[in-house]
């Protein structure tokens, strides 16, 4: 049997894992990206994208059965009739918790980013200064200016555009 050797192995093809694999590959590392879920093809795998609210059986709302079967996932704002197929089913993959902690999961290429409208806004200088300004929690070890060039790098790659307003 042929042995496969990799310089880097990335587990999870969510937003961070996918980006890490891209960066390693572009630097010439032989990279293996492992994902437990399916690939999500644009348009084809978004069966509800072009549906209007009145076209859903429950007008986009959850049923009592949905909530009963998914007590954790159903607490997420995005777990609705139009997107619940991207969430891991709580009964099939139960949570083990010592203390309450709502952690949603999505097993597919893109991970949870597919479940929260694929939107991420830049934090501002104000956001990074919160702990120091408000006098609680642990201060950030970096500031906005440290991340700004990386924000620009990623935004250029993914095609972010628009006004600064």
Could you tell me what each predicted segment is?
Residues 150-158:
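A structural-propensity feature for long, helix-poor, extended segments
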Residues 2-131, 136, 141, 145, ...:
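N-terminal glycine-rich phosphate/pyrophosphate-binding loop and immediately adjacent elements
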